[in-house]
């Protein structure tokens, strides 16, 4: 009989092992066997919990996305009701420590690439994209007309993605302060006319 809570402990071990494997070997070098080896468990257990490699990547990204959504919620609540502060909070969440470690950044890049080919991952990416745009649009709409708010949200989402991508590809730790400053300046520019 399995121990109570063991399923979640195993899943967490395997997700951590997946992040480390993608960090060290990339997605092509990450297999159910390599993840099992890093987690010090059998390949059969990995297969039991996740089915296949795409299932493992999906579960890993759901974990990363939960961290992102938690950081976003935490920061938006702390920002209270001020739209500028809440927009900055959304930006900051995307550059939160949970999103800018080497294993997580490499996993994001692998996920984006794989989501163009795997429908389950594509749906997950679509949910993430819509959530970001919706959150940004809701805050901009408190200060801008609806059409301008949608346009501003699209622009800021593209800036967040671009700054994050450049940082991820830079080959070293991401300069979150510089990224945040650029995004904050953009927010200030958009809201200056409001």
Curated annotation (Swiss-Prot):
Keywords: DNA-binding, Repressor, Transcription, Transcription regulation. Pathway: Amine and polyamine biosynthesis; betaine biosynthesis via choline pathway [regulation]. Residues 8-68 form the HTH tetR-type domain. It holds the Pfam family TetR_N. Residues 31-50 bind DNA. SUPFAM superfamilies: Homeodomain-like (SSF46689), Tetracyclin repressor-like, C-terminal domain (SSF48498). InterPro entries: BetI_C, DNA-bd_HTH_TetR-type_CS, Homeodomain-like_sf, HTH-type_TetR-like_transc_reg, HTH_TetR, Tet_transcr_reg_TetR-rel_C_sf, Tscrpt_rep_BetI. The keyword Transmembrane does not apply. GO terms for biological process: glycine betaine biosynthetic process from choline; negative regulation of DNA-templated transcription. NCBIfam families: betaine_BetI (TIGR03384), PRK00767.1 (NF001978). Repressor involved in the biosynthesis of the osmoprotectant glycine betaine. It represses transcription of the choline transporter BetT and the genes of BetAB involved in the synthesis of glycine betaine. This is HTH-type transcriptional regulator BetI. It comes from Burkholderia vietnamiensis (strain G4 / LMG 22486). The lineage of its organism: Bacteria, Pseudomonadati, Pseudomonadota, Betaproteobacteria, Burkholderiales.
